[in-house]
């Protein structure tokens, strides 16, 4: 409820510091919550709209079904996908949530699903498996209800075309269309 707005305010203050010093971005990008700051910095919405959206996002995510995440290092992404799919097929929920680098993927799901995936990936030769201290299974199917409620908040927000492209977390591609940004934030 408070963490996401605090991070947004801090990140936007850093953007403002550089903007007032004359630094101009050709592109903006931010990881997960940081994408909201990137969009505000690019002119896709004003600070107040961004703050309202991230507060709503934080509230909805905090109410979502329990879950957890883990960072997997030194495992092939296709192996992670395969193991997660096998565990999902068996009835637990776990998915690759973020591919941070070619060598690091974060998985997300129920505590049972994530533990099974961690055990299987460690046995398959992952270099490191690190449980993350998080309050939910972010970027997973367990966030579906929160995402649907966030869609309504996004629909009523004044989201405009940006002055500079924003690199989307969902596609990894530059986007400037306000309508496309709205849809991509929902998908995120």
Regions found by a protein language model. Name each.
Residues 9-16, 35, 48, 52-55:
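A broad detector of short, well-ordered amphipathic alpha-helices
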Residues 41-188:
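Alpha/beta catalytic cores of group-transfer enzymes, especially the acyltransferase/condensing modules
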Residues 1-29, 107:
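Helix-rich "cap/lid" substructures immediately adjacent to catalytic or cofactor-binding pockets
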Residues 21-30, 47-50, 95:
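Short, flexible active-site-proximal loops enriched in glycine and acidic residues
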Residues 16-21, 39-45:
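Alpha-helix C-terminal capping segments
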Residues 11, 26, 30-34, 38, ...:
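Gly/Ala-rich beta-loop-alpha elbow adjacent to hydrolase catalytic centers
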